[in-house]
Amino acid sequence: MSEKPQKSQKSEVKDYSKTLFLPQTEFPMRAGLPQREPEILKYWNDIGLYDRLRQEAEGRTKFVLHDGPPYANGNIHIGHALNKILKDVVTKSQQMLGFDSNYVPGWDCHGLPIEWKIEEENYRKKGKQKPDFRDSAAMVAFRKECRAYATHWINVQREEFKRLGIIGDWDHPYQTMSYPAEAQIARELMKFAANGTLYRGSKPVMWSVVEKTALAEAEVEYEDYTSDMVWVKFPVTSPAHGALASASVVIWTTTPWTLPGNRAISFSPKIAYGLYKVTDAPADNWAKTGDLLILADALAAEVFKQARVTTYEKVRELPADTLDAVECAHPLKGFSGGYEFTVPLLPGDHVTDDTGTGFVHTAPGHGREDFDVWMANARELEARGINTTIPYTVDENGAFTDHAPGFVGKRVINDKGEKGDANEAVIKALIDAGKLLARGRLKHQYPHSWRSKKPVIFRNTPQWFIAMDKDISANGHAKKGDTLRARALHAISVTQWVPPSGENRINGMIANRPDWVISRQRAWGVPIAVFVREKSDGSAEILQDEIVNQRIAEAFMEEGADAWYMDGARERFLGSRASEDWKKVDDICDVWFDSGSTHAFVLEDRQNFPQLGNIVRKVDGGSDTVMYLEGSDQHRGWFHSSLLESAGTRGRAPYDIVLTHGFTLDENGRKMSKSLGNTVEPQKVIKDSGADILRLWVCATDYADDQRIGPEILKNTIETYRKLRNSIRWMLGTLHHFKPSEKVAYAEMPELERLMLHELAGHAETVRNAYAAFDYKTVVASLAAFMNSELSAFYFDIRKDTLYCDPPSSPARKAALTTIDLLCDAILKWLAPILSFTTDEAWRMFRPNAEPSVHLTLFPADIEKLRDDKLAAKWETIRNVRRAVTGALELERAAKNIGSSLEASPVIYVADRDMLATLFDTDLAEVCITSNYEVRESEAPASAFRLDAVPGVAVVVEKAVGTKCARSWKISQTVGEDPEYPDVTPRDAQALREWKALGVGV
């Protein structure tokens, strides 16, 4: 190493810091987002940002993200925040990609949760009686209370969503309870009535005794529950099987209360069955010695164990293909004079020999598969003289009706959701009849209502359905095979699903789903606004009268759906037909039908939503796009109901793209729960750190899967944000000295600037493609890596000397400022959809005379043309050499041989002549931030520093020779050459003269 350079005496050192072009900006280092963001929201409101966005986008192709409506009940939670932020990023990025991306928020307003709240807060807590909905005035008054409650929470949630930085038409949101919406929902229902797919049927539905309503699949969750289980004997009666005359088919069930509704036994043709004989059993046992039992071979041993049978033998095999001719008696035959009917055996694909007996007790009024098997065989059963009418054995209160002789009034579940006395009553009757083989208890997963958290039952009820497999009629004519299921499956195949796995998921649901139950027996909703009369076969004829329908729709438009429940509504709407025997249906529509119709009263309503109502999608010969975006549970929710509603009335899906996100868990991967204390409230994150932190967290995660959030994850997000903000702040401060009139043309720029623009071009392609593909984590990862590694740690670090110390006239300095201006412009625009507040604050400092908001700009265009792959390849070599030099400098600094890298003058040994030629015209001192350097084509000393990743390069760090420049701190032998400024280099002396010429004292 060379000798240490001579240091100047302290008394001789001048302070040139004021002559440096250091960054200057009012953009603060500390973000202060919780205080600053509300000011930015006010600014957006003051400039009319939403309206300006619409004006800027006029005439563009439309990309509309149609809002899946949150429920107007309670404050928003972290799932709401994730969902709304994603929607906002989609909307803003599509707008900046050149589309007209208009976001109209909406709310789901009807339904049971609000009814529950009103009943609880306005009635139960006050000791008041729940309204009698048979009274028109009471019904209308209750509905007004529900409307007021929903309105309150819409206003609360609206402000919470706006605080997240969501830009949309908050002054004109859609609401499923608005009068135009209720009118259109009624019209949509009438379309199903007109095309022949709406019908009143008898079918088992999931029923909540506590809530007194049918539940959709999306409203049911499975929880642990302990059930009674029984093994029951059904005596064989069919004369064709004389050999089995004394035998019994054994079934197993965990719902003994459904046995009064039993009408068949299902078996599988794929299972091996046998006839078994009990050869020994305890005297007090329900299974008796000599009993002949028909069982699946694979389950016989377990059944006899449960029945406490000591020994048994298999009498004979019983081929499954002989079972469909077997008929049995009901085990309660003769009980209270009932159950005097034949119980046939029917083949069913749902039967297995994993558990039970290999036979499934089939009560078509209490199970979906039971119903399907029964109806699939209905014609054949009727030909055999078997009545296929499905009984109504259980009423809305969970009590047995007179269709269950001997058990009338017994409760399956009581009003509190507790197990009633029905099971024990049925079991006792079975014991008395000698038909119980065994009993026990089983803890298993059982369906519960997602609201009341109480168990539900399947019960046969009159409900309104939309048929999935009936040919759809148009003007009285139906095309064979043109069913709702067929239409929906086709629509799925021509929709873009993000991620693609969503297609298989919803396809499977549609392919296998039953008819769509759309009725609820509640008060707060849009009524099933049709009139019916009873037919002789027990079905309902729906009035098809366009004048009546128009009268209803017009009334709803002016007065809301309350008009249906007012005194005199029947006579008002029927008009001259009021004398006929038409009855008004008082059931309401399922809320999924409400929200499934939003496309009709938002995307197609030119009067109330004029900027959305003129959408012309590709399926209609246009170029506009509609996206739906919700959580993955909406494959069976809003995506599902919207698809069925639109396919049934318009023959296509209401959307072109469907994007789904996962659920939010705590940082340990657990479901959030107040009882666990692991919830993350968006309001607290905003108060502590700001909405931009939440926005960055959302976009940095893989939203397609379940995401995690918690203190440590937020801490890491804040650190990522801090680095991004610091880079933006440095660029803004540096550009304080930039004059647009001094821009440097690309061809005149140094290689380093052209290299950075090449890198910018690469990221431009990545970012645009990622935004177009809704891949926001790639946007964040790409820009964070670019800003931290390529800019802050490489380019900015190298160029600080040029930017701070070069004379104002320096071409290199002007080129660097021109480049940073381009970088800052692109980065602020690219980050705008994500860091909406931060980038807008920065934009107004960066471009004070341009657009008043970064959100009014487009993503930068034509950057891709700045690519220079040849230059990038050259600089890959240079940067490899820099890595070797940096490694050597770090060792010397650790050994305290040097402090700053400017104290060094590395000697770089290069063995490869091609590499040597590449380095020939490169100032490696500038690139490596040293005061000098030397490149040698010779053998390096054994002690030289080497990197395995950079073969052929070795580095020896020597001390820089010369005097330390008092201004730039570089060590140079040229210090002192300028007599006017003898303590600085000639470069710095020229800068000082130019400063002096500007009137600055130096």
Swiss-Prot record:
<dbReference type="GO" id="GO:0000049">
    <property type="term" value="F:tRNA binding"/>
</dbReference>
<feature type="short sequence motif" description="'KMSKS' region">
    <location>
        <begin position="671"/>
        <end position="675"/>
    </location>
</feature>
<dbReference type="Pfam" id="PF08264">
    <property type="entry name" value="Anticodon_1"/>
</dbReference>
<dbReference type="GO" id="GO:0005829">
    <property type="term" value="C:cytosol"/>
</dbReference>
<feature type="binding site">
    <location>
        <position position="674"/>
    </location>
    <ligand>
        <name>ATP</name>
    </ligand>
</feature>
<keyword id="KW-0963">Cytoplasm</keyword>
<dbReference type="InterPro" id="IPR009008">
    <property type="entry name" value="Val/Leu/Ile-tRNA-synth_edit"/>
</dbReference>
<keyword id="KW-0547">Nucleotide-binding</keyword>
<keyword id="KW-0436">Ligase</keyword>
<dbReference type="InterPro" id="IPR014729">
    <property type="entry name" value="Rossmann-like_a/b/a_fold"/>
</dbReference>
<dbReference type="InterPro" id="IPR023585">
    <property type="entry name" value="Ile-tRNA-ligase_type1"/>
</dbReference>
<dbReference type="InterPro" id="IPR050081">
    <property type="entry name" value="Ile-tRNA_ligase"/>
</dbReference>
<dbReference type="GO" id="GO:0002161">
    <property type="term" value="F:aminoacyl-tRNA deacylase activity"/>
</dbReference>
<feature type="binding site">
    <location>
        <position position="630"/>
    </location>
    <ligand>
        <name>L-isoleucyl-5'-AMP</name>
    </ligand>
</feature>
<dbReference type="InterPro" id="IPR033708">
    <property type="entry name" value="Anticodon_Ile_BEm"/>
</dbReference>
<protein>
    <recommendedName>
        <fullName>Isoleucine--tRNA ligase</fullName>
        <ecNumber>6.1.1.5</ecNumber>
    </recommendedName>
</protein>
<feature type="short sequence motif" description="'HIGH' region">
    <location>
        <begin position="70"/>
        <end position="80"/>
    </location>
</feature>
<dbReference type="InterPro" id="IPR002300">
    <property type="entry name" value="aa-tRNA-synth_Ia"/>
</dbReference>
<dbReference type="Pfam" id="PF00133">
    <property type="entry name" value="tRNA-synt_1"/>
</dbReference>
<comment type="function">
    <text>Catalyzes the attachment of isoleucine to tRNA(Ile). As IleRS can inadvertently accommodate and process structurally similar amino acids such as valine, to avoid such errors it has two additional distinct tRNA(Ile)-dependent editing activities. One activity is designated as 'pretransfer' editing and involves the hydrolysis of activated Val-AMP. The other activity is designated 'posttransfer' editing and involves deacylation of mischarged Val-tRNA(Ile).</text>
</comment>
<dbReference type="GO" id="GO:0004822">
    <property type="term" value="F:isoleucine-tRNA ligase activity"/>
</dbReference>
<keyword id="KW-0030">Aminoacyl-tRNA synthetase</keyword>
<dbReference type="InterPro" id="IPR013155">
    <property type="entry name" value="M/V/L/I-tRNA-synth_anticd-bd"/>
</dbReference>
<comment type="similarity">
    <text>Belongs to the class-I aminoacyl-tRNA synthetase family. IleS type 1 subfamily.</text>
</comment>
<dbReference type="GO" id="GO:0005524">
    <property type="term" value="F:ATP binding"/>
</dbReference>
<dbReference type="GO" id="GO:0006428">
    <property type="term" value="P:isoleucyl-tRNA aminoacylation"/>
</dbReference>
<dbReference type="InterPro" id="IPR009080">
    <property type="entry name" value="tRNAsynth_Ia_anticodon-bd"/>
</dbReference>
<comment type="subunit">
    <text>Monomer.</text>
</comment>
<dbReference type="InterPro" id="IPR002301">
    <property type="entry name" value="Ile-tRNA-ligase"/>
</dbReference>
<keyword id="KW-0648">Protein biosynthesis</keyword>
<dbReference type="InterPro" id="IPR001412">
    <property type="entry name" value="aa-tRNA-synth_I_CS"/>
</dbReference>
<keyword id="KW-0067">ATP-binding</keyword>
